[in-house]
Regions:
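Acidic, Ser/Thr/Gly/Pro-rich intrinsically disordered interaction regions
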Residues: 1-82, 112-311
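Flexible secondary-structure boundary motifs
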Residues: 82-124
Length: 311
């Protein structure tokens, strides 16, 4: 995902699809025929759900980061965070379906050649990000892939992350090889949360373009009320405050960034030119918590090579 969007202020932080749908509010739609809400209502509800779950994940992350030591309290906080994260990932996948329904509302049926063309274009433009999230969610739902937390500690800092658990051909449990490179990496929250915030705006930008083309409305300066934007603004602030300490392999990927300016503006972007806004760590202690199943005795810890640890 290579993308940049400028937000003039947090009171005007709505993704572009909101403005596009407000501009097209008086255009005839077929939502009732499809037994769907008005397209603006669909998007508002979907965005609200994503933002609400993002907020919950940030709250649980903050609680987890404040825990010192190991044991029962940390285990409970880890589990609460992973539950909130799982819920956020579900909402992101549902958001893609909701965006498709928004676009459907502008056409009498899906056989319309214009719908097919616009949907195909929207799907193609957002496929890489959607596939990334959907693969994680599908693995969790259909292959018993559990989310597991991983922590790196070093003097003066730490980095929280997670991986999707899988089983390799030798029966070793560890990071899923179809999701994590080599079955030995993980996702840092620092990158992951920035990526998903960027993804919300990335998908919305492409949806907005499709809405303008479907409705015939020209992009303009349609005013959008700031009412209700506070929750989104809080998430933006929260994500920007997560220390940008990425896992080692992530420094080779596109770097998502949330940059708050002194004038109140925000730049949300993803690209390799953001490398100066992120850092990794040279060495650290690692903590991983697996769940026993009464049978498995071999586990692989992220970033510690291909060898399995026996328990």
């Amino acid at each position: 995902m290579i993308f940049t969007t400028q937000i003039p202020s947090l009171s005007d932080a709505w993704p572009r699809a909101v403005r596009a749908l407000e501009s097209a509010r008086d255009v005839e739609t077929y939502h009732a025929r499809l037994r769907l809400r008005h397209p603006l209502a669909i998007y508002n509800i979907s965005l609200s759900q994503v933002v609400g779950r993002f907020s919950s994940a940030l709250t649980e992350l903050e609680k987890l980061r404040k825990v010192t030591g190991f044991g029962g309290e940390r285990d409970a906080k880890e589990e609460a965070f992973l539950v909130a994260l799982d819920s956020l990932l579900d909402a992101l996948v549902e958001h893609f379906d909701d965006c498709n329904n928004v676009l459907r509302c502008f056409f009498r049926n899906e056989a319309d050649p214009r719908y097919k063309k616009l949907y195909s274009k929207f799907k193609s433009e957002t496929r890489a990000y959607r596939d990334h999230v959907a693969k994680i969610v599908n693995r969790i739902k259909h292959s018993q892939g559990r989310l597991r937390s991983v922590f790196f500690f070093w003097p003066g800092g730490n980095s929280v992350g997670y991986f999707v658990e899988g089983v390799n051909a030798e029966g070793v449990v560890g990071p899923d090889e179809d999701i994590h490179a080599g079955g030995s990496t993980a996702f840092s929250v620092a990158r992951d949360f920035r990526l998903h915030l960027c993804g919300i705006y990335f998908v919305s930008t492409h949806l907005a373009q499709a809405i303008y083309e479907a409705s015939g409305v020209r992009p303009g300066g349609k005013h959008v009320s700031a009412q209700g934007v506070d929750a989104l603004a809080t998430v933006i602030r929260g994500v920007s405050c997560v220390p940008p300490v990425f896992f080692p392999d992530e420094m080779k990927k596109a770097i998502p960034s949330v940059k708050m300016a002194s004038d109140g503006g925000v730049t949300i972007s993803c690209g390799k030119d953001n490398r100066e806004r992120a850092a990794s760590f040279p060495s650290a202690h690692v903590k991983v918590r697996f769940m026993g199943d009464g049978v498995t005795r071999q586990f692989r810890i992220p970033y510690l090579g291909q060898s399995a640890r026996k328990w």
